[in-house]
């Protein structure tokens, strides 16, 4: 496949020469999100009949054949548009996404939200998973902080109650997946849903005081330190410590570092100290020639050398937290721009040799780019 022009090729207005190279790249990143990426989901990426975003677009901006719509994808897009309510059409789109989250995915019989619906709007995967519910809490908390509407507040409250009453275990952790009727599927806890639940709790605390959420968050972090952190390296493992064939993902180390380091509540906790060590280890063994690798074994051996745009964005966001990392940050922002962003959108993945290995653009990715940009601007 012919190499598509990157953002550097032009297709965007050029910032003032007075800006530093870093500021110029940041300007282009901000402009690319606003002028190219967000409009994809206002135009070709939007199914007006379903009032939902398509799951993904191809490189020519055509929707992929519809197999499903996920509640998590709807919630991520709600965050995206509620983050830019001042932009034309964003407030209306956020309101529509919020309505769709409630009408398409909510389980009126058992409570909670289905994982996905089919092309006709009928429940597809009827299980209740923590990852989905964490993003519903996150998106509703953020949206409520923007609009202050009573229905948004009640939806947030309902989602928090479901998490506390259905997913919570007696060890401070949360089940990854439950049946439609909340039956036990034996999933146990997994790292990624716990991380996004922590993110959702932090977003809730950013918009309101909530002692129950604060207790749940600190308890979750204590349990993760106990059961998921590798004591030798400080990295957060994907499965509980001692699980067979365990691994870690450098992108998640960088994502965790940002969440903990930016929280006055969680900064300087034992988990923060571990993840700071884990960051250094992940950077040493999991970043090669500027590319964040997908998966490594506990021993540091590469399992999957795929380079994913979300992991690159999380690395950039984390690097912005330390003035001493400014030079590395500038290099990594360049990597994000030149290897992943294109005039038409973005490359989702490259393989270990640097070749584009995934040619579609999922509706869930702009969430990572928007949170990365927000972190850089803050």
Which residues make up each language-model segment?
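Glycan-recognition and catalytic cores of secretory/periplasmic carbohydrate-active enzymes
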Residues: 4-378
């Amino acid at each position: 496949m012919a190499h598509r022009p990157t953002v550097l090729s032009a297709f965007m207005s050029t910032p003032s020469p007075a800006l530093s190279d870093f500021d110029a790249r940041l300007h282009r990143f901000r402009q690319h999100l606003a002028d190219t990426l967000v409009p994809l989901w206002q135009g070709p990426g939007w199914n007006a009949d379903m009032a939902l975003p398509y799951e993904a677009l191809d490189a020519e901006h055509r929707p992929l054949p519809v197999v499903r719509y996920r509640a998590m994808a709807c919630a991520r897009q709600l965050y995206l548009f509620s983050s830019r309510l001042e932009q034309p059409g964003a407030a209306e789109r956020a309101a529509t996404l919020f309505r769709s989250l409630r009408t398409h995915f909510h389980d009126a019989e058992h409570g909670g939200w289905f994982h996905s619906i089919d092309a006709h709007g009928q429940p597809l995967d009827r299980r209740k998973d923590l990852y989905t519910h964490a993003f519903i809490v996150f998106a509703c908390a953020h949206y409520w902080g923007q609009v202050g509407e009573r229905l948004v507040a009640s939806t947030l409250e309902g989602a928090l109650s479901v998490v506390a009453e259905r997913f919570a275990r007696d060890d401070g952790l949360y089940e990854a997946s439950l049946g439609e009727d909340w039956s036990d599927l034996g999933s146990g806890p997994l790292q990624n849903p716990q991380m996004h639940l922590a993110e959702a709790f932090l977003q809730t605390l950013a918009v309101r005081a909530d002692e129950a959420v604060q207790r749940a968050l600190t308890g979750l972090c204590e349990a993760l330190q106990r059961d998921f952190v590798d004591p030798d390296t400080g990295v957060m493992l994907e499965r509980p410590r001692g699980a067979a064939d365990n691994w870690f993902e450098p992108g998640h180390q960088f994502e965790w570092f940002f969440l903990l380091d930016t929280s006055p509540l969680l900064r300087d906790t034992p988990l923060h100290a571990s993840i700071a060590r884990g960051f250094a280890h992940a950077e040493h063994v999991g970043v090669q020639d500027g590319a964040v690798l997908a998966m490594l074994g506990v021993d540091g051996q590469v399992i999957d050398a795929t380079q994913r745009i979300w992991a690159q964005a999380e690395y950039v966001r984390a690097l912005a937290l330390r003035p001493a990392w400014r030079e590395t940050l500038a290099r990594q922002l360049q990597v994000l721009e030149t290897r992943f962003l294109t005039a038409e959108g973005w490359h989702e993945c490259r393989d270990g040799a640097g070749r584009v290995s995934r040619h579609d653009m999922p509706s869930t990715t702009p969430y990572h780019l928007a949170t990365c940009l927000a972190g850089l601007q803050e």
